[in-house]
């Protein structure tokens, strides 16, 4: 009995370190039925409830105005709103995990790797290495933190039918990982339209709470929007839907500390931006630009080599690095 109590105490301690289960709101007039309604609305943590607007909670079928007020009050008690010093936040940032890209030069450019708890957008033309980088990250995120991994699973949403599990197996061999275990640790799904894409992100919230995931990939985030919303007449509707989708991704990154990686396509820039020698820009407009924490621009080099440029980042300087697409994933470019 004492051993069981110790196990329960350890589980509770581990739970306190991560997001709080929405079941902690049960008490008083808040019942298990109310909690189920919140979970059906993809609100699995107290943090997600505390960060939701009153309007969003009122829209949940079965929850009345009085009950919503009580839920908000209890959630704010567990997750109080307030300020912290920049020094405290600086210390918290020191613990942020970064995932290796497979290339030492690319990791150096990124200050260590792909940052967890934020959205990284990777854009470029076809065959520039976006999907190959995603496949490599799907494996490296499973490595121990001491080996520049995230010690977690990967969630992979494919919208263009480019996911290949055999590619993961080859990359797993490179890192001397068990192929079957690596494949088991990647939750894969296909999205065929933008509504499905959003629905899958809602489903992801529950999966992230139930198990340890280090990485969420959407390859590509914009492809389905380009086919579902055609012409200027649907542009406003597309951007509104896209904004909702990206806010959901940011919420998952904030709550679960997962690295969110999305790929994007480019289009010709009619005004010549970003430069007179490379008149291409990522699609998605200002909504995509402001939602992505870090934006990486990939372009082709000679042979298997590719070039990555820091297009936008809150802390990284504008710079470039060369990497290569190798049989066993992304790696450093070989000297010719």
From Swiss-Prot:
Family matches, as Gene3D superfamilies: 5' to 3' exonuclease, C-terminal subdomain, P-loop containing nucleotide triphosphate hydrolases
Major subcellular site: nucleus
GO MF terms, alphabetically ordered: ATP binding; ATP hydrolysis activity; ATP-dependent activity, acting on DNA; ATP-dependent DNA damage sensor activity; DNA strand exchange activity; double-stranded DNA binding; single-stranded DNA binding
InterPro entries: AAA+_ATPase, DNA_recomb/repair_Rad51, DNA_recomb/repair_Rad51_C, DNA_recomb/repair_RecA-like, DNA_repair_Rad51/TF_NusA_a-hlx, P-loop_NTPase, RecA_ATP-bd, RecA_monomer-monomer_interface
Tissue: Highly expressed in ovaries.
GO biological process, one term: intracellular mRNA localization
Compartment(s): Nucleus; Cytoplasm
Residues reported to bind ATP: 124-131
Matching CDD domains: Rad51
Region listing for Disordered, in residue ranges: 1-20
Record's compositionally biased regions (Polar residues): 1-10
Source organism superkingdom: Eukaryota
Keyword terms: ATP-binding, Cytoplasm, Developmental protein, DNA damage, DNA repair, DNA-binding, Meiosis, Nucleotide-binding, Nucleus
Complex and partners: Interacts with Rrp6; the interaction is required for the recruitment of spn-A to the DNA-damage response foci.
Protein purpose: Plays an important role in homologous strand exchange, a key step in DNA repair through homologous recombination (HR). Binds to single and double-stranded DNA and exhibits DNA-dependent ATPase activity. Underwinds duplex DNA. Spindle genes are required for each of the symmetry-breaking steps that generate polarity during egg axis formation; oocyte positioning at the posterior of the cyst to generate the first AP polarity and inhibition of gurken (grk) signaling to the follicle cell layer to polarize first the AP axis and then DV axis. May have a role in female meiosis.
PANTHER family listed in its UniProt record: DNA REPAIR PROTEIN RAD51 HOMOLOG 1, RECA/RAD51/RADA DNA STRAND-PAIRING FAMILY MEMBER
Family: Belongs to the RecA family. RAD51 subfamily.
The protein's name: DNA repair protein Rad51 homolog
């Amino acid at each position: 009995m004492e051993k069981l109590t110790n196990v329960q105490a350890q589980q509770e301690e581990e739970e306190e370190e991560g997001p709080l289960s929405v079941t902690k709101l049960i008490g008083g007039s808040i019942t298990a039925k109310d909690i189920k309604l919140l979970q059906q609305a993809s609100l699995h943590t107290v943090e997600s409830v505390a960060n939701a607007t009153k309007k969003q909670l009122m829209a949940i079928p079965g929850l009345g105005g009085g009950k919503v007020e009580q839920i908000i009050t209890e959630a704010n008690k567990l997750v109080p709103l307030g300020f912290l010093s920049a020094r405290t936040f600086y210390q918290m940032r020191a613990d942020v995990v970064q995932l290796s890209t497979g290339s030492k030069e690319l990791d150096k450019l990124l200050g260590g790797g792909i940052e967890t708890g934020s959205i990284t957008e990777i854009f470029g033309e076809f065959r520039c290495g976006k999907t190959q980088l995603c496949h490599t990250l799907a494996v490296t995120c499973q490595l121990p933190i001491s080996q520049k991994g995230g010690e977690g699973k990967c969630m992979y949403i494919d919208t263009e039918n480019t996911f290949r599990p055999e590619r993961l197996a080859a990359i797993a061999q490179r890192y001397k990982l068990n192929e079957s275990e690596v494949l088991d640790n990647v939750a894969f799904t296909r999205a065929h339209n933008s509504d499905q894409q959003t629905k899958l992100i809602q489903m992801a919230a529950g999966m992230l709470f139930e198990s340890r995931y280090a990485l969420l990939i959407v390859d590509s985030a914009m492809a389905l929007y380009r086919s579902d919303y055609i012409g200027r007449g649907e542009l406003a509707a597309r951007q509104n839907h896209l904004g909702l989708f990206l806010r959901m991704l940011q919420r998952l990154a904030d709550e679960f500390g997962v690295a969110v990686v999305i790929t994007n396509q480019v289009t010709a820039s009619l005004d010549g931006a970003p430069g007179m020698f490379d008149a291409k820009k990522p699609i998605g407009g200002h909504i995509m630009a402001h939602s992505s924490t870090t934006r990486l621009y990939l372009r082709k080099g000679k042979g298997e080599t590719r070039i990555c440029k820091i297009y936008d980042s809150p802390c990284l300087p504008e710079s470039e690095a060369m990497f290569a697409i190798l049989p066993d994933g992304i790696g450093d470019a070989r000297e010719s």
